[in-house]
């Protein structure tokens, strides 16, 4: 009995320690986001100073004008937002297409070649951003390519594509390997088989890769900083860096961050719910 109670106590404390560690990690990860969200509902220009609940910053962000202080919101913020959306969507679309085709090609390789290419695909993901940024900067200089919007998009495609490959590969491994050949035997062209047979199976992985590419593109600073050139192009990450160097952050960034986070959160929830429904329907069949 004594040994049994000791084992139970050890089990309790080990579970308690594991849960406490998990909650600590969650607090460290999400407390800053929660703080930004909370202080997006106050007009104070000093972060952390609560001056009362208001939607004023959201109104400023949407209208581009601060009616209380009678000043215009920094127009560079909206230019940075526009370039961020252009870069993120362009890079995500191209990365999703290239990553999906690359994943299909890797899947059809021999086992040894597949392992080699998969290992090479993982290198850009573990490579420090600053190293990737400097490497691409030197490449563009060597090739004589003027840095600007196009080079930023190319750079983002380079580091986003491996993540799409990683998102699509599990769907390929779970898929019946004979359905593509069966479609060809039934008279479908390779393009028809790809579009009507493979794509529906890979769609969840492609969507996950697309959303991941968008978030990675929005989040990136190092690669963008070295590939944007000096023609005034700014994304949100480089705008925030330049804004912080001036001595503070534009208050309208708080509601902007909150809206971006909520949008991505809702998209992820929708995708997870849809994936769970599909898995349940497959199990019932």
Which residues make up each language-model segment?
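Short membrane-interfacial helix/loop motifs at transmembrane-helix boundaries
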Residues: 2-3, 31-73, 227-231, 278, ...
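C-terminal transmembrane helix and the adjacent membrane-cytosol boundary/short C-terminal tail
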Residues: 2-10, 15-20, 169-180, 184, ...
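Transmembrane-helix boundary motif in ABC transporter permease subunits
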Residues: 2-13, 86-121, 138, 271-276
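Membrane-interfacial helix termini and adjacent extracytoplasmic/periplasmic loops
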Residues: 4, 8, 55, 63, ...
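Interhelical loop and adjacent transmembrane-helix boundary motif
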Residues: 8-15, 45, 57-69, 218-276
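Transmembrane alpha-helices
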Residues: 20-21, 28-33, 165-171, 175-177, ...
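A structural signal for multi-pass alpha-helical bundles of membrane permease subunits
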Residues: 30-45, 83, 132-144, 167, ...
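Loop-to-helix entry region at the N-terminal start of transmembrane alpha-helices
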Residues: 76-86, 141-164, 205-206, 210
């Amino acid at each position: 009995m004594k040994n049994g109670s000791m084992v139970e106590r050890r089990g309790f404390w080990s579970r308690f320690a594991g849960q406490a560690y998990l909650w600590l990690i969650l607090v460290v990860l999400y407390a800053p986001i929660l703080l930004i969200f909370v202080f997006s509902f106050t007009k104070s220009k000093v972060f952390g100073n609560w001056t009362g609940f208001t939607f004023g910053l959201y109104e400023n962000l949407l209208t581009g004008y601060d009616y209380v202080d009678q000043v215009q919101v920094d127009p560079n913020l909206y230019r940075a937002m526009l370039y961020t959306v252009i870069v993120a969507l362009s890079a995500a679309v191209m990365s999703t297409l290239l990553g999906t085709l690359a994943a299909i090609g890797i899947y059809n390789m021999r086992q040894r070649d597949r392992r080699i290419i998969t290992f090479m695909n993982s290198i850009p993901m573990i490579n420090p951003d600053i190293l990737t940024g400097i490497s691409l900067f030197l490449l563009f200089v060597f090739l004589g390519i003027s840095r600007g919007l196009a080079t930023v998009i190319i750079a983002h495609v380079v580091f986003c594509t491996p993540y799409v490959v990683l998102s699509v590969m599990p769907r390929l491994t779970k898929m019946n390997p004979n359905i593509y050949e069966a479609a060809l035997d039934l008279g479908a062209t390779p393009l028809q088989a790809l579009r009507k047979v493979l794509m529906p199976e890979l769609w969840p992985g492609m969507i996950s890769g697309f959303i991941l590419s968008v978030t990675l593109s929005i989040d990136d600073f190092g690669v963008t900083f070295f590939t944007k050139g000096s023609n005034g192009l700014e994304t949100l990450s480089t705008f925030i860096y330049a804004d912080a160097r001036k001595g503070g952050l534009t208050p309208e960034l708080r509601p902007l961050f909150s809206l971006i986070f909520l949008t991505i959160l809702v998209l992820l929830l929708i995708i997870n719910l849809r994936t769970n429904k599909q898995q349940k329907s497959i199990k019932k069949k």
